[in-house]
Amino acid sequence: MDDMEEVYRMVEMSDKGRGLVATRTLNAGELVLSEKMFLKLDSSSAKDVSVFQRLHPEIKEKLSKLSCPTEDMVDFDTSDPDSHCLLKKFRLNRISLPGKSDTAVFETISMINHSCIPNVFWFWMEDETTMEIRVLKKIEEGEEIVTTYIHLDSGAEFPLRHQRMRMLLPWKFVCRSFVIY
């Protein structure tokens, strides 16, 4: 996104860590962000602390900038607190690749907060290393940019309520209703 105007800025949100807000009015269909992942792991590696101990320092630095809740959201112990925190950050901020057991994290896209009523949607590009974020409905300047953490593939049926609740368990969210534009 180097050659594009940034239409968002990152801010501290009072109740949910950091997030993105629009720097100007954004209209439906408009591109917000196109970004390459910086780390991809399969589901078994995403649970292996030794993988996080061996990460390249540049990747560790990028991962360390993502959200890390104080409560423990990882269901196993480790004696290495730094790697444990990186593991928690990966697990909290990862996005699944469609139809695969691989998950990835991004420097900026991973900062977009969840909403049961999203105003942007995300999709993987064909190369499966790049994701785009586009506007679902008009977003006013200063309004938070939010997405649903449930992948809504245009070819798939909308998940049933109990499926949506299970999908959101890792983040401890409960959506009582969903609105998709």
Where are each of the predicted segments found?
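Catalytic cores of histone-lysine modification enzymes
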Residues: E30-W122, P170-R176
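Conserved SET/PR-domain catalytic core that frames the SAM/AdoMet-binding pocket
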Residues: E12-S45, E132-A156
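Short, structured beta-strand/loop micro-motifs enriched in basic residues and often containing a Trp
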Residues: V7-G17, W122-M131
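Generic detector of ordered secondary-structure context
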Residues: R18, R24, D82, A104, ...
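Residues embedded in well-ordered secondary-structure elements
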Residues: D15, S101, R164-R166
